[in-house]
A protein has these predicted regions:
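Generic beta-sheet signal
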Residues: 2-4, 41, 168
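Short, glycine/charged-enriched secondary-structure capping and boundary segments
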Residues: 14-17, 53-55, 106-109, 161-164
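Core catalytic region of metal-dependent phosphoesterases/phosphodiesterases
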Residues: 1-33, 111-119, 123-129, 139
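Active-site environment of divalent metal-dependent phosphoester hydrolases
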Residues: 2-13, 31, 46-51, 98-103, ...
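Binuclear metal-dependent phosphoesterase catalytic core
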Residues: 32-34, 121, 131-140, 152-183
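Active-site donor-binding loop signature of nucleotide-sugar glycosyltransferases
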Residues: 27, 43, 168-170
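Active-site-proximal loop/helix segment associated with metal-binding centers of metalloenzymes
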Residues: 34-128
């Protein structure tokens, strides 16, 4: 599983869930499956973070939380450089997406922005971080053909610059077919 914005980062950084077919993985992990090299990076901005913080303070007196300050994705040039020396990435799975992918409309933010004026700027940083990752992979000539993400709770697909970007809705699945025709 890739870390979402409503997920406790420690479950992923410490790989607390490790089952045969389901596990939490740290950001910048590489999964090799069906002949693909898949880069996984989680995180995104929670537009409802003020609500979550107030709710946690009122109802989660034991210290449990539903918001984490380190929820956003981060760009790590050193890790991407090291990955580029070792392996070629053909598929990317992230929680959010580059700025040129849907969801581009900011219509749903106005109510949340009234409660948290930093939301628009943080959403911009969030998407620009994905832009940096995209540009790094392109500049390093990784043969990326697929990029999957969720976060926006909608479905959308489009090919952009030779990459099929797929935004997945809640409980939507996509099959990444084997890159080996004999399989």
């Amino acid at each position: 599983m890739v870390r979402g914005n409503h997920d406790d980062p420690s479950y992923f950084n410490k790989e607390k869930i490790k089952h045969e077919r389901c596990r939490t993985i740290p950001d910048y992990s590489i999964i090799q499956a069906c002949g693909h090299n898949i880069l996984c990076i989680g995180g995104a901005v929670s537009i409802d973070r003020n609500y979550r913080k107030k709710h946690d303070a009122k109802y989660h007196l034991s210290g449990t939380a539903s918001y984490w300050a380190d929820e956003m994705p981060y760009y790590d040039e050193a890790i991407l450089n090291e990955i580029g020396k070792q392996i070629r990435i053909d598929t990317v799975i992230t929680h959010t997406a580059p700025s040129f992918c849907e969801l581009i409309s900011k219509n749903g933010l106005s109510g949340w922005t009234a409660l948290d004026p930093a939301i628009p700027a943080d959403c911009e940083i969030d998407r620009k971080t994905m832009d940096l990752i995209y540009k790094h992979l392109k500049a390093d000539r990784h043969p990326v053909h697929h990029w999957y993400y969720g976060h926006f709770h909608q479905s959308w697909n489009s090919e952009i610059n030779g990459i099929l970007f797929s935004m997945l809705d809640i409980m939507e699945f996509k099959e990444l077919r084997s890159s080996n025709p004999a399989s």
